[in-house]
């Protein structure tokens, strides 16, 4: 309907709440199977996780299994608080040890918490940056995203849809406010990640 040709389901993973990666993966599998039974058949759905960055998360056994299925991509959510160097260090430790490509989720949402210097550190990370459709409808966030585009940072687009009511997908907003090239670049990054496995 909105030009979407792939779904990447990334339920939140909070290490301090989970007993193990395996338990999380089992719950995720059951939820996905249940969802598929209730709705129309979705043929292009990939499972992953949105990993909350916590201290020492890089020491967690089997964390590499949270990468997006069929890719070397792994999605991280930074804490919504003042920036500290350990946050990027944890991401880099995981990606380096397991040869994964990190994606920093909804990079525009940290604007209220991070200074310009903090953002410089985040954007220096060897990572891909994910931007949600909502950023294209918020003046401050959209201005930030335009700078990322202008400076040719690697971006992937997302909806962060949780439902079809108050957290529904809104890709039409991206289509209205941006160049088609952004969408093509995002798709190319996702396609390339499948080829490097």
Regions found by a protein language model. Give the residues of each.
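Hydrophobic residues within beta-strands of alpha/beta enzymes
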Residues: 7-8, 129, 157
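Mid-to-C-terminal alpha-helical segments outside catalytic/metal-binding sites
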Residues: 171-197
